[in-house]
Amino acid sequence: MNATDLKLYLVTHRYDDNEATFLAKIAAACENSVTMVQLREKMLSTRAYFELAQRVKLITDRYQIPLIIDDRVDICLAVDAAGVHIGDDELPVAMTRQLIGPDKVLGVSTKTVETAVAAVAAGADYLGVGAIFPTQTKANAAVTPIATLKAITAQVAVPVVAIGGVKEANLATFKDTGIAGVAIVSEIMQAPDIAHKVQALRTKLKAVLPNDR
């Protein structure tokens, strides 16, 4: 896997923002040191997704932050993103690895130790585990217990990122879980002051992540 910092992983969501506002939010988050950005767009046409990904990559490249594309291997390759993140409904992990090659980052969503171990064996570079807390972004997502998160981090040799309802107020929950970082959606994308929120999250994470001192 490419040298990748997963500490504060922004996963985008458009909500009701127009494109200019959406891009400005991503830029503010990057300027204030999120460490990775995942572009997640479920409703756009392929052409629209490609064009948006190009614009987002201009921002992430400016700040030298890796861009990960959610689900779409074709979009990842078309814009030369750093990698792709897949879930249960996408291509199998091994097939995705074959398509993107050995050098791009492959993230995989998982909820159990068994699927986590299988994903790593098939070529995953990092795992996204959750939803740890209830989340409006994926309202029907089953909650993954902290005990399961700890069991996964203990069983796999790749970095694990906690996702789902993660907020500044609950970051302390992740102390001593073995995670490499947290993936955050609404806490950043809907923050009234994104710069302040990202800085506050980075400060709180220093007390939570053993590699963030």
Swiss-Prot record:
One of its GO terms (cellular component) is cytoplasm. 2-[(2R,5Z)-2-carboxy-4-methylthiazol-5(2H)-ylidene]ethyl phosphate binds at T135, Q136, T137, G165, V185, S186. One of its GO terms (molecular function) is magnesium ion binding. It comes from the Bacteria. Mg(2+) binds at D71, E90. Keywords: Magnesium, Metal-binding, Thiamine biosynthesis, Transferase. InterPro entries: Aldolase_TIM, ThiamineP_synth_sf, ThiamineP_synth_TenI, TMP_synthase. Binds 1 Mg(2+) ion per subunit. Pathway: Cofactor biosynthesis; thiamine diphosphate biosynthesis; thiamine phosphate from 4-amino-2-methyl-5-diphosphomethylpyrimidine and 4-methyl-5-(2-phosphoethyl)-thiazole: step 1/1. The keyword Magnesium applies. Pfam families: TMP-TENI. 4-amino-2-methyl-5-(diphosphooxymethyl)pyrimidine binds at Q38, L39, R40, E41, K42, D70, S109, K138. Its EC number is 2.5.1.3. It catalyses: 2-[(2R,5Z)-2-carboxy-4-methylthiazol-5(2H)-ylidene]ethyl phosphate + 4-amino-2-methyl-5-(diphosphooxymethyl)pyrimidine + 2 H(+) = thiamine phosphate + CO2 + diphosphate; 2-(2-carboxy-4-methylthiazol-5-yl)ethyl phosphate + 4-amino-2-methyl-5-(diphosphooxymethyl)pyrimidine + 2 H(+) = thiamine phosphate + CO2 + diphosphate; 4-methyl-5-(2-phosphooxyethyl)-thiazole + 4-amino-2-methyl-5-(diphosphooxymethyl)pyrimidine + H(+) = thiamine phosphate + diphosphate. Signal peptide: none annotated. Coiled coil: none annotated. GO terms for biological process: thiamine biosynthetic process; thiamine diphosphate biosynthetic process. Belongs to the thiamine-phosphate synthase family. Condenses 4-methyl-5-(beta-hydroxyethyl)thiazole monophosphate (THZ-P) and 2-methyl-4-amino-5-hydroxymethyl pyrimidine pyrophosphate (HMP-PP) to form thiamine monophosphate (TMP). This is Thiamine-phosphate synthase. The lineage of its organism: Bacteria, Bacillati, Bacillota, Bacilli, Lactobacillales.
